[in-house]
Amino acid sequence: MKGNANIKSAIKRVKTNEKRRIQNASVKSALRTAIKQFEAKVENNDAEAAKAAFVEATKKLDKAANKGLIHKNAASRQKSRLAKKLNGLSA
């Protein structure tokens, strides 16, 4: 876990980087899961559940963008595409 670092601060950085990497992976995984759940509900033509899943996915996209996990424009693009799918379901 400590790699090849000899300096105390470098050892600490390796440790914190590993913690952050695990946390970021967890958040990204939850984000992908939320998007997949939304798309599954759209696929089943379940408008009410899709709306709730859309809100959840949008929330997770915004949080990921605020934390710098994904670029804000990437989050915006994803939200736009999800909204388009939701609106297509209503029509």
Swiss-Prot record:
<comment type="function">
    <text>Binds directly to 16S ribosomal RNA.</text>
</comment>
<dbReference type="InterPro" id="IPR036510">
    <property type="entry name" value="Ribosomal_bS20_sf"/>
</dbReference>
<dbReference type="GO" id="GO:0015935">
    <property type="term" value="C:small ribosomal subunit"/>
</dbReference>
<keyword id="KW-0689">Ribosomal protein</keyword>
<comment type="similarity">
    <text>Belongs to the bacterial ribosomal protein bS20 family.</text>
</comment>
<protein>
    <recommendedName>
        <fullName>Small ribosomal subunit protein bS20</fullName>
    </recommendedName>
</protein>
<dbReference type="GO" id="GO:0005829">
    <property type="term" value="C:cytosol"/>
</dbReference>
<keyword id="KW-0687">Ribonucleoprotein</keyword>
<dbReference type="GO" id="GO:0003735">
    <property type="term" value="F:structural constituent of ribosome"/>
</dbReference>
<feature type="region of interest" description="Disordered">
    <location>
        <begin position="72"/>
        <end position="91"/>
    </location>
</feature>
<dbReference type="Pfam" id="PF01649">
    <property type="entry name" value="Ribosomal_S20p"/>
</dbReference>
<keyword id="KW-0694">RNA-binding</keyword>
<dbReference type="GO" id="GO:0070181">
    <property type="term" value="F:small ribosomal subunit rRNA binding"/>
</dbReference>
<dbReference type="InterPro" id="IPR002583">
    <property type="entry name" value="Ribosomal_bS20"/>
</dbReference>
<dbReference type="GO" id="GO:0006412">
    <property type="term" value="P:translation"/>
</dbReference>
<keyword id="KW-0699">rRNA-binding</keyword>
